[in-house]
Amino acid sequence: MKVSKMLLATGVVLSAGVFLSACGKSSSSTTTYSYVYASDPDSLNYLTTNRATTSDVITNLVDGLLENDEYGNLVPSLAESWTVSQDGLTYTYKLRKDAKWFNVDGEEVASVKAQDFVTGLKYVADQKSEALYLIQDSISGLDAYVKGDEKDFSKVGVKAVDDYTVQYTLTRPEPYWNSKTTNNILFPVNEEFLKSKGKDFGSVDPSSILYNGPFLLKSLTSKSSMEFVKNPNYYDKDKVSLEHVKLTY
């Protein structure tokens, strides 16, 4: 699990940035925790915003291909396995088949599929994400597409090989490429939902995104509070001990 996600799940500490542990208290059942936070997220658009106030929240709501465990090691998340070509240019990820998208009410919307990663990257490029610099020169064809020299996104080095296999082709070998997959710029998004929300996708409204992670954001009131509840249908729910987290400004 990612460090902040793992800490939320175990209730030991809530990570730096949004989650501050000093003022925390637990209920007698130890499944509800209350803390304070210092800064409101000004967006939930995890694909275009490169700010800690967004990523500290999103990391507990949306999963990517890989994540860091409590020791900083890269471990599987949505990708249950992966391979790297001999020349170090092609990374192929096999997705778990039990990961689902849920709306803010916890209702299942769709399965998480390889095309969601392709859709996410195209959106990142089209919207000129704040975090593009992390990957623009890494993925084959992405720089040309972003600059407008290439109009066909299918020429960019990402593809859904099948429903549960996504593949990235790099411009050069990057031994640290897998670490980049933990950044929300490479997270998936459901295309149908994205289109339905339009410019409202990722606004400061819990219903503006879909969830595939351990928590759902039940409420967010500026300079007041944020409330998270456990996603009861999360594929790794047995490792999430907290049922409810309330952060107070």
What is the predicted role of each segment?
Residues 1-8:
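Bacterial N-terminal signal peptides that target proteins for export
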Residues 19-22:
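C-terminal motif of bacterial Sec signal peptides marking the signal peptidase cleavage site
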Residues 24-26:
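Bacterial signal peptide processing site
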Residues 66, 70, 97-100, 122-129, ...:
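Sec-exported extracytoplasmic/periplasmic mature domains
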Residues 153-154, 163-164, 169-240:
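Gly/Pro-rich hinge or "lid" segments in bacterial periplasmic/extracellular proteins
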